[in-house]
Amino acid sequence: MADLQTQMKQAVAAAAVEQIKDGMVLGLGSGSTAALMIQALGAKLASGELRDIVGVTTSFQGEVMAAELGIPLRNLTAVDRIDLAIDGADEVDPSFQLIKGGGACHVQEKLVASRADRFVVVVDSTKIVDRLNLGFLLPVEVLPGAWRQVQGRLAELGGIADLRMAQCKAGPVVTDQGNLVLDVSMAGGIGDPEDLECRINNLPGVLENGLFVNLTDEVLVGQISDGVAGVRRLQRRE
């Protein structure tokens, strides 16, 4: 039997797939919960429950998985619009602001989310927080030759930034764009995500950061109630 966290992720992934309609162009997110969603989508396509779906993936991992499941794919540049994007998050605050980028895919994830007519976030209950960045570091993608300079500028903004090192290779993590990632902890967490997103992205050498501000339309949360996995739809706090 799957552990409780996996059960929550499976429940919320299944709920997200129920929002998909025939003929949609879909943004297919990254991470463990999004992977379960892609698997559920593949099963519905294989059974004929869904038809004429086109996927736009946000990572190499998602592209490989979707292709293996027979989900038709296109590049972001080949579609005029995305009807629905479904993705996970590392943290979600009460105003539906997010931190993403634990898998270093946040640049493509943000491109897809911002293109979508509707962006639905799927998480388990451990990802819901009152304030961002108290429990999860903020990823900032930087040009390889600029990481030291950006590290210093982030310190001026009150952040401690460490270069993300790879687990299965010597040296740092390298993104799909060929860049490096700084993981940032802001003193006291992030009180104004919109302001900080702009400040960081204005630093020379920064490509993008993992704050997703004013993009999310709905948050589906997997939770356990009386030992049974279910789904709760969050209400946004304005």
From Swiss-Prot:
GO terms for molecular function: ribose-5-phosphate isomerase activity. Substrate binds at S30, G31, S32, T33, D87, G88, A89, D90, K100, G101, G102, G103, K127. It catalyses: aldehydo-D-ribose 5-phosphate = D-ribulose 5-phosphate. The active site is at E109. It holds the Pfam family Rib_5-P_isom_A. The keyword DNA-binding does not apply. Keywords: Isomerase. One of its GO terms (biological process) is D-ribose metabolic process. The keyword Iron does not apply. Homodimer. Catalyzes the reversible conversion of ribose-5-phosphate to ribulose 5-phosphate. Belongs to the ribose 5-phosphate isomerase family. This is Ribose-5-phosphate isomerase A. It comes from Prochlorococcus marinus (strain MIT 9313).
